[in-house]
Swiss-Prot record:
Keyword Glycosyltransferase: no
Gene Ontology molecular-function annotations: alcohol dehydrogenase (NADP+) activity; zinc ion binding
Entry EC number(s): 1.1.1.2
Reactions that this protein is recorded to catalyse: a primary alcohol + NADP(+) = an aldehyde + NADPH + H(+)
Protein's recorded name: NADP-dependent alcohol dehydrogenase C 1
Top-level taxon in the UniProt lineage: Bacteria
Cofactor note: Binds 2 Zn(2+) ions per subunit.
């Protein structure tokens, strides 16, 4: 066992504070690595503020983790000391259900996936995330970060990247397809870059035009304000695929009307309240309303390799751990373009 520095939440109302946590001893199949960078995901904030249920405090958030291997177990074959690696939203699953065997561990129907933080590991201890100096994870849930991807830019790909890559791949985004992205934030800006790299024609749908210049620079061919009622008339029946990256309650009927025959609107965010789904827009053009959650280990590795090949990198702002609480406030105020990444050097010393 080892003791490492970390930042933890102790309640829904208090700021995160520096503390120490214990990491398990490296087992035969484990990989230990020093964390160099950890992204801040809005899910971290939802969790520590108990908006998705009361967590098991203290909580060390962070499921966008990148670093360098320091030790491997005696049976490890995939990694060696010095390798550049990452960990995303989960660190284990049952490994026996059909979904796990298919490389869709995020949909595990056995134990359910074991979250990187605020979950219980196989040994009965709580999992703690990437706002820390080091971590120990089973090799089967560790990802290899390609040499051409900087570690700081790679970190957000382990949640924001795979959350958008998976539905783009599943619903066949590519040449000849028109993709719309609702929201240009942490998820949305990566979705635009990925869809463009896949060869799709990309449109951003945002409440206002204030990020229009960014959207076009990132790869969108068009940018529309959803606050303008004419937008929905103008774009009716235009898209093969729409990714909803925001957690706000939307008029689903209006957005479904933007889809072509057999088009799909994919929910990636988690609205606070249920949304009404009108039947007519679904029936009229055999449209689909569906959802997607992160991605399995094989697909996440595929995503990292794709991003390296196509030079897809999130737009990030690097911070130190003592700025985490201010960063949370800025995320809530939509004052980040487009992902905070914590440089954890001070937690490794």
């Amino acid at each position: 066992m080892s003791t490492v520095s970390a930042y933890a939440a102790t309640s829904a109302t208090e700021p995160l504070t520096k503390t120490t946590i214990t990491r398990r001893a490296v087992g035969p199949h484990d990989v230990a690595f020093d964390i160099h960078f950890a992204g801040i995901c809005h899910s971290d904030i939802h969790t520590v503020k108990a908006e998705w249920g009361v967590p098991n405090y203290p909580v060390v958030p962070g499921h966008e983790i990148a670093g360098v291997v320091t030790e491997v177990g005696s049976e490890v074959t995939k990694y060696k000391v010095g390798d550049r690696v990452g960990v995303g939203c989960f660190v284990d699953s049952c490994r026996e259900c059909d979904n796990c065997k298919a490389g869709l561990e995020q949909y595990c129907t056995g134990t359910g996936m074991v979250g990187t933080y605020n979950a219980i590991d196989r040994d009965g201890t709580p999992t703690h995330g990437g706002y820390s100096g080091a971590i120990v994870v089973d090799e089967n849930y560790v990802l290899r970060i390609p040499d051409s991807l900087p570690l700081d830019a790679a970190a957000p790909l382990l949640c924001a990247g795979i959350t958008t890559y998976s539905p783009l791949r599943h619903w066949n985004a590519g040449p000849g397809k028109k993709v719309a992205v609702i929201g240009l934030g942490g998820l949305g800006h990566v979705a635009v870059k990925l869809a463009k790299a896949m060869g799709a024609d990309v449109t951003v749908l945002s409440q206002s035009l204030k990020k229009m210049e960014d959207g076009l620079r990132l790869g969108a061919s068009a940018y529309y304000a959803t606050s303008d009622p004419e937008t929905f008339d103008k774009l009716a029946g235009s898209f093969d695929l729409i990714l909803n990256t925001v957690s706000a309650n939307l008029d689903l009927g209006a957005y479904l009307g933007l889809l072509k025959l057999d088009g799909a609107l994919v929910e990636l965010g988690l609205p606070e309240h249920p949304m009404e789904v009108p039947a007519f827009p679904l029936l009229a053009q055999r449209r689909n309303l569906t959802g997607s959650m992160i991605g399995g280990i094989p697909e996440t590795q595929e995503m990292l390799d794709f991003c390296a090949e196509h030079d897809v990198r999130p737009e990030i702002e690097i911070i130190t751990p003592d700025y985490i609480n201010e960063a949370y406030e800025r995320v809530l105020a939509s004052d980040v373009r487009y992902r905070f990444v914590i440089d954890t050097a001070s937690l490794r010393s």
